[in-house]
From Swiss-Prot:
Biological-process GO terms, alphabetical: carotene biosynthetic process; carotenoid biosynthetic process
Coiled-coil boundaries: none
Entry keyword annotation includes Plastid: yes
Lineage of the organism: Eukaryota, Viridiplantae, Streptophyta, Embryophyta, Tracheophyta
Cofactor names: NAD(+); NADP(+); FAD
Origin: domain of life: Eukaryota
Function description: Catalyzes the conversion of zeta-carotene to lycopene via the intermediary of neurosporene.
Protein name, entry field: Zeta-carotene desaturase, chloroplastic/chromoplastic
Length: 587
């Protein structure tokens, strides 16, 4: 099986480059052409003719019966002095912060070292016109901060609602489901989903039910804040350790929870904090729509980052692409306080010093480590950040000349007149990619191409074993694993492929790491942080990034008078220094 492609391994602070096209052929056999699905497929719906795409329904109300920290109330109108703000990083956290500050009347400039915005939710178009993503982006029904942002910028129609099921694809094309479609909502719809799932055997389902019944999830039904406190206190153990101590089985972890953990945090249940998984479970138990999934109509740059960018520009904000921060300039006052005096920026051979009243680092974990002055590690606050590490992830796109996930009708899977297959996020315990989707079905605006078939986007987690491999080898391995999951795709060819490698993506939400996450407000008076790794009640995710931006903005507005006073103080010091320089030159 021969393939050819090229790509570059990149860190999160620089553009990821993608792979060129490749063809991979499989020999057709009459056996697999006659392949028929089992009785499970009778439960699957045919793709909907009309797809719901608004945010006015099927969204969890996080204002009531939910931990207060997950969805802050609307901020009061800011009446303080207008501030000049410089944001490093045009990812979702940076743009969320910018939107909030612009709405409060501040002046905002965003600096991004890449040629495109969006960070981990960014995408770009290659020379052949293919949209290349940094990863697979799925929106839970409890992403209220992100939904609020999308409605604010006029992008509420850009998400497509999927069937309320979580589908597991097992080796040989056998499907399992957590089917949340039920006449009664939370918590009964979830109880029904777990009791009737065909992904686990009866014994494992029973032990699973016992473990969940003994969890803080039950308390969340009546006391969400108390349950969240309990969940935070479980951060120091892994989910596997907690789950099995409550009676759960190793089979349940391997066949159901590991794929979910990989999809959430890119690490398995033995390595992910119990806090991370139980945060999600508590929302699934208390909010009917929390487990309902949405995906973008098309590429993130067009349907997610694009509308936010347009809103920021319309409000007077400015983007400065390809401008990277080389150094944070700072001084100490006579009373020992540290404050930032500027940012040393560069773009190719150009250099400049950016001055502002407020400086915000909206970076990922490796980005903030590179940015912080080494002397600042004398503060425990900043030193703790170096105890966090990112998880490597590899995202692979495979374009086929047929419909890989169409399991009911082999002939239909070979025709290219109409899209066919499973239109949802898909999990698997039997491949190196724990979650994947056919974007030609799930996000058709940019990924469905007339005369072409499936575009599988597969997220390889953990990505460590794949990082050193050439793209040809990665594509070959993933193609074989796709065939093992979908034997009926025997004979379909890979007509194009791409590989994006990110050395450190989400921070590794392992046991005991939550205390090292920093607040958005730092010991440096005019320097703030934003990013999904920073302290917020949700996990490292798009929702967490958006929430961190709201929290950073709130801290800045609360300190508006103090920051304006610091501006005057710094201006006076600069004036005195310039007078001294002038006098020296006269002498």
């Amino acid at each position: 099986m021969a393939t050819s492609s090229t790509s570059s391994t990149t860190s999160l602070c620089f553009p990821a480059t993608s792979a060129a096209g490749a063809r991979t052929s499989f020999r057709t056999t009459d056996t697999f052409l006659r392949y028929r699905r089992s009785r499970q497929l009778t439960r699957l719906k045919v793709r909907k003719a009309v797809v719901r795409s608004d945010l006015d329904r099927d969204v969890s109300d996080m204002r009531t019966n939910a931990p207060k920290g997950l969805f802050p109330p609307e901020p009061e109108h800011y009446r303080g002095p207008k501030l000049k703000v410089a944001i490093i990083g045009a990812g979702l956290a940076g743009m969320s912060t910018a939107v909030e500050l612009l709405d409060q009347g501040h002046e905002v400039d965003i600096y991004e070292s890449r040629t495109f915005i969006g960070g981990k939710v960014g995408s770009f178009v290659d020379k052949q016109g293919n949209h290349i993503e940094m990863g697979l982006h799925v929106f839970f029904g409890c992403y209220n901060n992100l939904f609020r942002l999308l409605k604010k910028v006029g992008a509420e129609k850009n998400l497509l609602v999927k069937d309320h099921t979580h589908t597991f694809v097992n080796r040989g094309g056998e499907l399992g489901e957590l089917d949340f479609r039920f006449p009664v909502g939370a918590p009964l719809h979830g109880i029904n989903a777990f009791l009737t799932t065909n992904q686990l055997k009866t014994y494992d389902k029973a032990r699973n039910a016992v473990a969940l019944a003994l969890s803080p999830v039950v308390r969340a039904l009546v006391d969400p804040d108390g349950a969240m406190t309990q969940i935070r206190n479980l951060d120091n153990i892994s989910f596997s350790e907690w789950f099995m101590s409550k009676g759960g089985t190793r089979t349940s972890i391997q066949r159901m929870w590991d794929p979910v953990a990989y999809a959430l945090g890119f690490i398995d249940c033995d390595n992910i904090s119990a806090r991370c998984m139980l945060t999600i479970f508590s929302l699934f138990a208390t909010k009917t729509e929390a487990s309902l999934l949405r995906m973008l109509k098309g590429s993130p740059d067009v349907y997610l980052s694009g509308p936010i960018r347009d809103y920021i520009i319309e409000k007077g904000g400015r983007f400065h692409l390809r401008w990277g921060c080389r150094e944070i300039l700072y001084e100490k006052s006579a009373n020992g306080e540290t404050y930032v005096t500027g940012l040393a920026m560069s773009k190719a051979t150009q250099k400049q010093i950016v001055k502002a009243d407020v400086y915000i680092a909206a970076c990922d974990v490796p980005g903030i480590k590179r940015l912080l002055p080494s002397n600042w590690r004398e503060w425990e606050f900043f030193d703790n950040i170096y105890k966090l590490v990112g998880v490597p992830v590899v995202t692979v796109q495979l374009r086929y000349n047929g419909w890989v996930t169409e399991l009911q009708d082999v002939e239909r899977s070979r025709q290219l007149r109409q899209a066919a297959g499973l239109d949802n996020l898909l999990y698997t315990p039997d491949a190196d990619f724990s979650c994947f989707a056919d974007l030609a079905l799930a996000s058709p605006e940019d990924y469905y191409i007339e005369g072409q078939g499936s575009l599988l986007q597969c997220v390889l987690t953990p990505g460590d074993p794949y990082m050193p491999l050439p793209n040809e080898e990665i594509i070959s391995r993933v193609s074989k694993q796709v065939l093992a999951l979908f034997p009926s795709s025997q004979g379909l060819e890979v007509t194009w492929s791409s590989v994006v490698k990110i050395g450190q993506s989400l921070y590794r939400e392992g046991p005991g790491k939550d205390p090292f996450r920093p607040d958005q407000k730092t010991p440096v008076k005019n320097f703030f942080l934003a990013g999904s790794y920073t302290k917020q009640d949700y996990i490292d995710s798009m929702e967490g990034a958006t929430l961190s931006g709201r929290q950073a903005s709130a801290f800045i507005c609360d300190a508006g008078e103090e920051l304006a006073a610091l501006r005057k103080q710094l201006a006076a010091i600069q004036s005195i220094d310039s007078i001294g320089v002038d006098e020296m030159s006269l002498v």
